């Protein structure tokens, strides 16, 4: 496993055979010591560490065998959870990148170490790791590695919701992709898209739709790049969230579908999440189209997480509150644990409750609020706030008598509007009739 071993060992050894002077006697000892140490790695990692230390003692001047030994020591310490020692060894390895190994080899090695350590869930450790790397790269002038490390640090700040620190990194990243006159350098399209994706995620998390909209449009106009589908997935997912929050359900639907296809292509588990969002947009736009008719989405139709969402759709379309809430309860973790879905499920629940409420109160002039509460299966306080909302937006004409816990309906007012319209219509007919009569006279 290439990632597991900080690059395939055979490839490393191949590199070394041609870069070392094979007549140099000490190299044979170093090589033997290195391979003996490596043989101990699986069964006795602690003995392997002592043995790799001997490689460092034998090498005298910094060279590739020491570099290789340090890589193995970083890996073993990471696996053993000896993080302070791992950091010490990493700092030691970074002193080799200026002269002891070739630029290309050190870049490949650090890249693979970064990818490997990035699997850790220890935020503080990762932060120290990335910052140490960036410090070492200040002198090394390695733009690609600098960009990659900064992007990883940016993602870390995004996860930790440290937006001030993230903005500082975004500024540096943007500057690295600008022309002399401060415009986006379109020759760096792929990197630009990565920066946009990071920034778009930040504004999505902050619910700053104004900034998000401008960036989102810009990102879709970068044509020079061959974007990684994962990056495009991130951008389209954020676009979908933005459109959904603005009530543009069809645009959201399109974006979530594009995001799903991109995530699917890159093998990202976010594809299932985006399918859920697609179903959500489908409900909100009251679409009759089945999102699972498409060739890409069909294989996921019976995925348990997706199934819960599709069952939700049919309960929603039938205004079946009991079933809707039952599905939410049974599948609480895979629906309501997602803050974005939770944000909109409440809107869907309000829509259903309003429909049921209107049907429920139709025959009455006065109705007890506790009775509505029982029928809708929500607290009296929630019924009152729903009624207030409906009265304010003229869905219901009436008033709440809080003392007696009653809703008094003004059917006359409701009929009154109809009566006024009829009256207006009769008057118009009258005047039309008079105009015709006077013409004929």
Curated annotation (Swiss-Prot):
> Bias regions of kind Acidic residues — which residues?
1-23
Cellular compartment(s):
Cytoplasm; Nucleus
Q: Per the UniProt entry, what is one GO biological process?
A: protein deneddylation
How is this protein annotated for GO cellular component?
A: COP9 signalosome; cytoplasm
Region described as Disordered:
1-29
Q: What InterPro entries does the entry give?
A: 26S_Proteasome/COP9_Components (IPR050871), PCI_dom (IPR000717), TPR-like_helical_dom_sf (IPR011990), WH_DNA-bd_sf (IPR036390)
The PCI domain, residue ranges: 252-414
What keyword terms does UniProt attach to this protein?
Answer: Cytoplasm, Nucleus, Signalosome
State the oligomer form and interacting partners.
Component of the CSN complex, probably composed of cops1, cops2, cops3, cops4, cops5, cops6, cops7, cops8 and cops9.
Q: Describe the family membership recorded for this protein in Swiss-Prot or TrEMBL.
A: Belongs to the CSN2 family.
**This protein is called what?**
COP9 signalosome complex subunit 2
